[in-house]
Amino acid sequence: MNFYVDTSVWGGYFDKEFSEWTVPFFEQAKQGRFTLVLSDVTIGELQNAPKIIMELTTAIPPQYIELVSITDEQLELADQYVKEGALTPKFHSDAQHIAIASIIKVDSLVSWNFKHMVNFFRIKQYNSINLKYFHPIIDIRTPKEVTYETEE
């Protein structure tokens, strides 16, 4: 399994509201249960975050992280999300995350962004646009939904 992880998940590790599910998600990534896909868009956003959040990226063994750079094709798809009203220009970076994850065919984009990403109606919009332009559909989930259950 490979999961594109947006910036909200990295920050969720240290957030009381989200850490209950984010910490186990990253622990399982460290164990190699899945590969985390990290884009240059995410890295750029993390550089503006508190240092402790950026340092979390180095806690994942490199063999379980795939680094990707945004392509012209992905930028064009992100632009289409905005042009067709799925997102406003203010949230173009969210459109970029979704476009990258769509085109590289990850198993899921993982996010805590309920307004723009983990949102049933918006996912329908993204997938409609993806299909219109012959791109794969995208699955978007929270860390809670993709973390393996542990027996207690």
Which role does the model predict for each range below?
Residues 22, 61, 93, 116, ...:
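Residue-level detector of alpha-helical recognition elements and their boundaries
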Residues 37, 68, 139-141:
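General small-molecule cofactor/ligand-binding pocket signal
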Residues 66-125, 147:
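Active-site neighborhoods of divalent-metal-dependent phosphate/nucleic-acid chemistry enzymes
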Residues 1, 15, 43-44, 104-152:
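Acidic, PIN/NYN-like endoribonuclease modules and their adjacent C-terminal/linker elements
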Residues 29-30, 72-73, 94-95, 128, ...:
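Short, charged/polar low-complexity linear motifs in solvent-exposed/disordered segments
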Residues 1-38, 44-59, 65, 83-89, ...:
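Short, well-structured N-terminal submotif of metal-dependent ribonuclease cores
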